[in-house]
């Protein structure tokens, strides 16, 4: 899947394992955006990474999972959540149960879990922009 963007600040990726999403509980620290809320893997771009390279590196750093590009299902460019006037990339991918079972949780965040789509979309403990982006995907693939 080729994503045509050369200037972006970072990526988030919604990874579906069956009918659930892999989520990470952010640290409960003041001074970080959205403390103590559930979010999706991803983060800031390093160097001239492609969107997939950025997301894959972040997933490996956060969860110890190696992604391959054939896991990608969908992508869309959005305004950055952190940097006004900049863009970020949102990806949707699939994760196998074997990959989920092999997670080695890194040092960012308090924990991880598979969350149902309904809970992810309705919870007030999930980053709202990420809820909107998952909703966009679900609307488009109906």
Where are the model-predicted features located?
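Residue-level recognition of short, well-ordered coil/turn positions
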Residues: 125, 141-142
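Unchanged
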Residues: 44-71, 76-133
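N-terminal strand-loop-strand
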Residues: 1-39, 67
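C-terminal alpha-helix
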Residues: 133-141
